[in-house]
């Protein structure tokens, strides 16, 4: 039975799921908005929000924790130099999910997940090809 087990399986084993969310978190930090399915967007919130909270206090230990979770030095740099200071006064809720219809191929519900307060110049990036 799966009583009280949190998180979605998304028809993947744990290593595939971990790698997928690591890649998606990196894409979201880099581009500040990505398009994905609603279920993946809701799960991605649980990965990205703690990373941004970690980036609010810049220390070597926190940078190492962020690197352990993302495995990307560029993403860690952006987290601690741009996103941490940007959300210093916000006590959580750094992402927004906007539903955007159904995917043409399989009618899966799609959504944009974006960082709140992002600069408007950032354009949406479709990460479905990467999956």
From Swiss-Prot:
GO biological process: translation
Keywords: Ribonucleoprotein, Ribosomal protein
SUPFAM superfamilies: Prokaryotic ribosomal protein L17
Pfam families documented for this protein: Ribosomal_L17
InterPro entries referenced in this protein's UniProt entry, alphabetically: Ribosomal_bL17, Ribosomal_bL17_CS, Ribosomal_bL17_sf
Gene Ontology molecular-function annotations: structural constituent of ribosome
Stated family: Belongs to the bacterial ribosomal protein bL17 family.
PANTHER family: LARGE RIBOSOMAL SUBUNIT PROTEIN BL17M, RIBOSOMAL PROTEIN L17
Subunit record text: Part of the 50S ribosomal subunit. Contacts protein L32.
Protein's recorded name: Large ribosomal subunit protein bL17
């Amino acid at each position: 039975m799966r009583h009280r087990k949190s998180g979605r399986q998304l028809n993947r084993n744990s290593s595939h799921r971990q790698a997928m969310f690591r890649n998606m978190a990196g894409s979201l930090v880099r581009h500040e908005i990505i398009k994905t399915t609603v279920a993946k967007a809701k799960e991605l919130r649980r990965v990205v929000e703690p990373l941004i909270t970690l980036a609010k206090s810049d220390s070597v230990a926190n940078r190492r924790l962020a690197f352990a979770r993302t495995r990307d030095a560029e993403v860690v740099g952006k987290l601690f130099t741009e996103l941490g200071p940007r959300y210093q006064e916000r006590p959580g809720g750094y992402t927004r999910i906007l539903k955007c219809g159904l995917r043409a191929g399989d009618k899966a519900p799609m959504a944009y997940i974006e960082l709140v307060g992002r600069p408007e110049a950032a354009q949406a990036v479709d990460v479905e090809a990467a999956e």
